[in-house]
């Protein structure tokens, strides 16, 4: 929320020059603050893992649920606000919950047309350097004891302004943006997709959906109350209580499997890890590795896990996929400068790891994976 305030205050003058009918600075600021606060309100237990393993069955994700909550259950609270930390709104002003719902996620909302001033501000919430990732990357690095290169958040904010109908970054800040993207990539590869975390993901995947079925009666859009009460801690509390269920029952079995995971008694072992070539065909990698090791492996299970880090996600507000760069030498917004900046960084970096449930077969699986993935 604090970074949203800093962005709002910094771009205010240029926003009003481009959109004279924009609402008061306080209302714009609080709209962005709420979007920063609530953009992940739709997450279930274990964040994006819940999206992949549970919500995908209904064709939705946490952003769909978050927008539903903002426009529904939270709408009255949002409409009741009359000030930001900086100032009170103008008389008669209030935040439209749909503004918050629209600006906090990438995709458009069918049938909804946001005001032009809000559309211009969307890259502050959805882009390569947002109030979200500018906050969590340095914070997570600090909490994990990782020393990143300098992340000059204030420089990025200082050189951000509205030009035409979108957010623009002055060329003087391209170095700061590039350093931030490099730090973000490092965190994804070394922390968010760490091999230990992926072992936990594989282990939980075997029981996660089955566990959630016991706690959530159906689609969260139809059971908002139950969904809002479901979080990491309520799940842990439930599976701990299931240890008292009768032996042999489904809940007792799930409780015992969760107990092993919590104790780090994980059934998956890392056998091989590589960053593949950009042109590598990974579509049938698991099948090829399984065939290569089948002669000596017996009944061993193999999982090929592809962890992906996108450092420049598609930004629907610009054709280039990145923030537009203002070139002071020409006085124009240069899309070519954006392409030049992006070309310096991996656009789609992958780490491929091969896991097996047999510690005795680690070497055989390693050699098979190497022969397949390096060929």
Q: Where does each model-flagged region fall?
A:
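Sequence-structural signature of the catalytic-core scaffold of metal-dependent phosphohydrolases
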Residues: 1-34, 42-263, 271-273
């Amino acid at each position: 929320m604090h970074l949203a305030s800093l962005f709002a205050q910094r771009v205010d003058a240029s926003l009003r020059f481009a959109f004279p009918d924009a609402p008061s600075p306080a209302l714009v600021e609080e709209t962005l603050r709420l979007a920063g606060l609530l953009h992940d309100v739709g997450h279930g237990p274990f964040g994006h893992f819940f999206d992949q393993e549970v919500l995908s069955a209904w064709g939705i994700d946490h952003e769909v649920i978050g927008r539903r909550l903002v426009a529904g259950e939270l709408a009255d609270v949002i409409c009741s606000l009359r000030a930001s930390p900086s100032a009170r709104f103008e008389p008669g002003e209030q935040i439209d919950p749909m503004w918050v719902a629209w600006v906090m996620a990438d995709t458009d909302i069918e049938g909804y047309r946001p005001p032009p001033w809000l559309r211009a501000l969307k890259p502050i919430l959805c882009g390569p350097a947002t109030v979200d990732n500018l906050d969590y990357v340095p914070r997570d690095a600090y909490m994990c004891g990782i020393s990143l290169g300098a992340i000059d958040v204030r420089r990025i904010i200082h050189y951000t302004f509205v030009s035409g109908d979108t957010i623009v970054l002055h060329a003087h800040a391209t170095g700061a943006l590039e350093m931030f993207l490099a730090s973000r990539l490092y965190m994804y590869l070394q922390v968010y997709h760490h091999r230990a975390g992926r072992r936990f993901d594989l282990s939980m995947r075997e029981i996660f959906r089955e566990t959630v079925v016991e706690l959530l009666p159906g689609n969260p859009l139809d059971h908002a109350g139950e969904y809002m009460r479901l979080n990491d801690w309520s799940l842990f509390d439930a599976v701990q209580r299931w240890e008292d269920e009768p032996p042999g029952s489904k809940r007792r079995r799930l409780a015992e499997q969760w107990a092993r995971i919590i104790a780090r008694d994980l059934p998956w072992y890392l056998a091989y890890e590589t960053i593949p070539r950009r042109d590598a065909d990974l579509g049938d990698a698991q099948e090829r590795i399984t065939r290569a090791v089948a002669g000596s492996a017996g009944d061993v299970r193999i999982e090929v896990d592809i962890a992906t880090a996108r450092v420049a996600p598609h930004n629907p507000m610009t054709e280039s996929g990145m923030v537009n760069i203002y070139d002071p030498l020409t006085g124009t917004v240069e899309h070519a400068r954006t392409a030049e900046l992006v070309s310096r960084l991996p656009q789609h970096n992958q780490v491929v790891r091969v896991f097996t449930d047999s510690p005795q077969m680690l070497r055989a699986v390693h050699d098979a994976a190497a022969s397949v993935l390096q060929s």
